[in-house]
Amino acid sequence: MKLFVHLSIFFSILFITLPSSYSCTENDKNALLQIKKALGNPPLLSSWNPRTDCCTGWTGVECTNRRVTGLSVTSGEVSGQISYQIGDLVDLRTLDFSYLPHLTGNIPRTITKLKNLNTLYLKHTSLSGPIPDYISELKSLTFLDLSFNQFTGPIPGSLSQMPKLEAIQINDNKLTGSIPNSFGSFVGNVPNLYLSNNKLSGKIPESLSKYDFNAVDLSGNGFEGDAFMFFGRNKTTVRVDLSRNMFNFDLVKVKFARSIVSLDLSQNHIYGKIPPALTKLHLEHFNVSDNHLCGKIPSGGLLQTFEPSAFAHNICLCGTPLKAC
């Protein structure tokens, strides 16, 4: 009986002292604790207790085979910066620091050590400085969302060198300059472009015309000139928003893809007539207000179903839903 008790105690102690196949590594735990410290030890991360397993019960932490593969810190009272030790979580696949208005500083260069990262969400924060060129070293990245921050400077041309990227989502920042010429040479996927509400300007590179973008949103900038490169009868584009810019082209010359369901060209310097081809589209959203358009609105299709405000403030547009010609 005594032997049985001693053996039971021995194996119990042995089981406790052996590392669990589910527990995180010391390297990952230490990196997480340094990240927590850099974020000001917020109450949001109170479950990150150094005496417990970081793969079990730590808020926002996901693990696979004892390694941290997902980290999500969102919607909390966080005051601090992204620790350079984020790069020590080398198996990370998803990183989400979003809706953190007091998260400041830059994107640390050590993020380039995350070679397996496929999802990066850094949105609705106070991150600032330029979007670094080295972010293009994340070749596995599929989803990139840097929207609603305080980023300044130009769009890095190196973003075109990310072969798996499905969208360039850098809207609602303070970016300046023009669309890089390198965007005419994407090395892999043709990503959706979400560049709205920045301080971008200049003409769109003609080289973009060879691409079939699914969605383009350049609204709320200072772009000028033509925008033919986003259109084409044989393309499969679904959504185009060029509103609140200074685009200047003849609308009747534009060849529209039959796939377009949302088209906003309002508040530009677009002239000419509304082409009859627009009556063939299954539009859910349409706006050409505040331009220099003239002539009768083509009848048929869905154009007459939109509010008069979608056509308002042009030079001499007429016909339903506006006044008769």
UniProtKB/Swiss-Prot annotation:
Subunit structure: Interacts with MADS domain transcription factors during flower development. Component of a complex made of FLOR1, VSP1 and AGAMOUS (AG). Binds directly with AG.
LRR repeat locations: 65-88, 89-114, 115-140, 142-162, 163-185, 187-211, 213-233, 234-256, 257-280, 281-305
Pfam family, one: LRR_1
Cellular component, GO, one term: cytoplasm
Protein's job: Promotes flowering transition in long days (LD).
Tissue-level expression: Confined to flowers and inflorescences (e.g. inflorescence meristems, floral meristems, stamens and carpels).
Induction comment from the UniProt entry of this chain: By shift to long days (LD).
Gene inactivation effect: Delayed flowering.
Keyword terms of this UniProt record: Cell membrane, Cytoplasm, Leucine-rich repeat, Membrane, Nucleus, Repeat
SUPFAM superfamilies xrefs: L domain-like
Note: 'Flor' means flower in Spanish.
Name the record gives this protein: Leucine-rich repeat protein FLOR 1
Family to which this protein belongs: Belongs to the polygalacturonase-inhibiting protein family.
